[in-house]
UniProtKB/Swiss-Prot annotation:
It comes from Bacillus cytotoxicus (strain DSM 22905 / CIP 110041 / 391-98 / NVH 391-98). It holds the Pfam family LutB_C. It comes from the Bacteria. This is Lactate utilization protein B. The keyword Cell inner membrane does not apply. [4Fe-4S] cluster 2 binds at residues 321, 364, 367.
């Protein structure tokens, strides 16, 4: 899978999402639950806004000194016996991982959840050279078996219910029991256990890399990442270059923010800090590789969008987004959905595929308020719109013509006078009382579900002129 998850046009994807009543119900229920849990977990701290400010400061400081911390991380991983590869592009990252697999004659690979491996199409790259790649995160495994893309950063199978999951297992894996989550989890655990034991390579993502120790931190609720790191003889960790913290102290803060914001827990079931195996340790990989992926992040770092790199992938913004609630994750056409995806996807994937996403927002600001590291997401969406129109020149032709006509009318006193007199007459067939209740063209989509005020028949200038004559102040 690559970053782009659909070849359908944006409007078609949105239409599919709106028509999927089950998906919208599942998303609404999940958003409500996750939102409530996040508020409870935040209230336990008592000073949530101070923690957010601290998280923002840590992320900004790290990004401002990213070159230093990346070099420090690389040196410390190397000192501990690991191999570090800096990949400028997604192709370089995928090729390096392919080469490691070839040298190890690997045929079986097990991996834990990782957004950046999806971004670089890693599974496809390994399958090209004959490797079987198995997802070990339960949600990702469900989607892999069903050949279905993720719809959420933290809960990738959010759009499926337990009956649908049972049917997938029944059809693809020969599952014969009920749709009880415990029974299905037990079945998958037994199925995956052999995959862990047989794999020559284990591949993980990285929630945070600690510069001064050369350690990686993984946050999970299933423990699968721990098995991926400890059983296969070769481990490959893949991380975006921005996923850095200077020391364990900063890690402590950000892990707390991540767990509370993502799932409403003080900590997830497993928070693992590891790296290359040391002499005194009895388990872990014999060979360790860290792949640090740029793939456009350097350009973002030097742009007006650099704040998006503060993201810790908690999905708190997704869990409060009204647009996501109504259209679902697949409508975004990217592995990164929701507000964070609407900002990040055009930067990583380009405007050709994702130019509509910055407009898929009500600009209510709920995402900005929810973000634990205070990314001004709605402001960044507005910046995208500005770039699309002013720098890219990608505004639709109808919009360009409409704005041109408005500009001409608004900048000419004579045209403005004529237009203000003609507007009530032109809209009268579509007006009931003082409201426009039905429209034509682009107005039709608006008036199908709402009304807007009709232009006043009496212009302000005429009213003012009349009252001025009468001396009415």
């Amino acid at each position: 899978m690559s970053m782009k998850i659909s070849e359908k046009k944006f409007n078609d994807r949105v239409g599919d999402g709106i028509q999927d009543s089950f998906m919208r119900g599942a998303v609404t229920s999940a958003q409500t639950r996750l939102y409530t849990n996040r508020l409870k977990a935040a209230d336990e701290l008592g000073n949530w806004e101070e923690w957010r400010e601290l998280g923002e400061q840590i992320r900004q400081h790290t990004l401002e000194n990213l070159d230093y911390y990346l070099m420090q991380l690389s040196e410390n991983v190397s000192k501990r016996g690991g191999n570090v590869f800096f990949a400028k592009t997604k192709e370089e990252a995928a090729n390096y991982i392919q080469e490691v697999a070839k040298k190890k004659n690997a045929k079986k690979v097990v991996k834990s959840k990782s957004m950046v491996t999806e971004e670089i199409s890693m599974n496809h790259a390994l399958e090209e050279i004959g490797c079987e790649v198995v997802e070990s995160d339960l949600g990702e495994y469900i989607l892999q078996v069903d050949n279905d893309p993720p719809s959420h950063i933290v809960a990738p199978a959010l759009h499926k219910n337990k009956t649908q999951i049972r049917d997938v297992f029944k059809e693809k894996l020969g599952y014969e029991n009920s749709d009880d989550p415990y029974e299905m989890t037990k079945f998958v655990r037994k199925h995956l256990r052999k995959k862990f034991m047989d794999a020559e390579i284990g591949i993980t993502g990285c929630n945070f890399a600690v510069a001064n120790t050369g350690s990686l931190c993984l946050v999970t609720n299933e423990g699968n990442a721990d098995l991926v790191m400890s059983i296969p003889k070769t481990q490959i960790a893949v991380m975006g270059m921005e996923r850095m913290v200077p020391t364990m102290e900063e890690l402590d803060v950000l892990v707390g923010l991540l767990c509370r914001s993502a799932v409403g827990q003080k900590l997830t079931s497993y928070v693992t800090v590891a790296g290359p195996i040391q002499e005194e340790e009895i388990d872990g990989p014999e060979e360790f590789h860290l792949v640090i992926v740029d793939n456009g992040r350097s350009e973002i770092l030097g742009s007006e969008f650099r704040q998006v790199l503060q993201c810790i992938r908690c999905a708190a913004c997704i869990n409060v987004c009204p647009v996501y609630r109504h259209v679902g994750g697949h409508s975004y056409g990217s592995i990164y959905p929701g507000p964070i995806g609407a900002v990040l996807s055009p930067l990583l994937g380009g405007y050709d595929d994702y130019k509509e996403l910055p407009y898929a927002s009500s600009l209510c600001g709920a995402c900005t308020e929810a973000c634990p590291v205070k990314i001004p997401l709605h402001d960044l969406l507005l910046k995208h719109r500005q770039v699309i129109v002013e720098k890219e020149g990608r505004a639709p032709l109808a919009e360009k013509l409409a704005m041109k006509m408005f500009s001409m009318g608004a900048s000419s006193a004579a045209l403005y006078k004529i237009g203000s007199k003609m507007a009530p007459v032109a809209l009268s067939p579509f007006t009931s009382g003082n409201r426009v209740t039905k429209g034509v063209g682009p107005l039709k989509n608006w008036t199908e579900i709402r009304e807007f005020p009709a232009p006043s028949k009496e212009r302000f200038r005429d009213w003012y002129k009349e009252h001025k004559k009468g001396g009415d102040k």
